[in-house]
């Protein structure tokens, strides 16, 4: 059932104010790593923000941010409209569904070198991605920025970039918030939930269509 916009806004407002004191509303809590409180990590993040980021803004055409994220064939919309006091239900596969890993690069104007594997990312898969997908798509002098994970610290992958006159630059530990590709993934998953692909082939098609339409 579809509700008029003014009614939908009223329901959303009432959900918030019903559990508030007039100035504070109960909302979902975000979590950050407790390890960020360590002095060495605080300094590393400060150095990144005050020294590296200004240089990045001066030469954005040289940057590619990469990361991986899980994509599933049971994605569905998580929110909708309903009268106050009534639950809202939807349908999604609870039994047979698949989880894949999607890895891609974010430039200043596009998503490049998208790649999907079944299961979790590991060292050999990451090496293959860099060698066969990402490195051939890079211009000489490109800096590839990524999370500080052991899987990413591969001599084989670094060699593949070096052969293209490119190199890795690792983010401070526990700092995914410093990688703008996280915002791209948020948009991408919102589209996937809207599309609701239920097979691997349909998921691949949806990811390709989204990447082609993406505008950072």
Predicted regions and their residues:
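Short functional hotspots at interaction and active-site rims
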Residues: 1-216
